Amino acid sequence: MSMIRIAPEVHLVMDPDTAVVAEEREDSILYSMDPVFERMDKLDGIAEDLLNSLSPSKPLLNSWPGRENTSYMAGIYGNAFYGIVVGLAFSGLLALIIFIQRLIEGGM
């Protein structure tokens, strides 16, 4: 909240937000909230980025333009890789069990 001093010698100030002209009082202290509002806007952007990180289709705060679906594609590739690895491990284990059963039965 900033004040414009219209006439400092007669203590007249104006609030630019409401365009009200008033007498400046000696017994009140006026603090500017602009730095607080700037920090709140920055924190609001960080909180919005935290919420956007939960959605794979939203852009992140520090990412390059055009990388909105990066998390989605990384999830597809990562899950496909682990699916193939688990599938091959299961198939190899199944083949080993079948091979051992045939050895036990005596046929080759």
From Swiss-Prot:
Task: Give the molecular function GO annotations.
Answer: tetrahydromethanopterin S-methyltransferase activity
Q: Which GO terms describe its cellular component?
A: plasma membrane
In what pathway does it function?
A: One-carbon metabolism; methanogenesis from CO(2); methyl-coenzyme M from 5,10-methylene-5,6,7,8-tetrahydromethanopterin: step 2/2
GO biological process per UniProt: methanogenesis, from carbon dioxide; methylation; one-carbon metabolic process
- Main localization, broad class: membrane
Q: What does the function comment of this entry state?
A: Part of a complex that catalyzes the formation of methyl-coenzyme M and tetrahydromethanopterin from coenzyme M and methyl-tetrahydromethanopterin. This is an energy-conserving, sodium-ion translocating step.
Q: Which HAMAP family match?
A: MtrB
Q: What is this protein called?
A: Tetrahydromethanopterin S-methyltransferase subunit B
Q: Mind giving the lineage of the organism this protein is from?
A: Archaea, Methanobacteriati, Methanobacteriota, Stenosarchaea group, Methanomicrobia
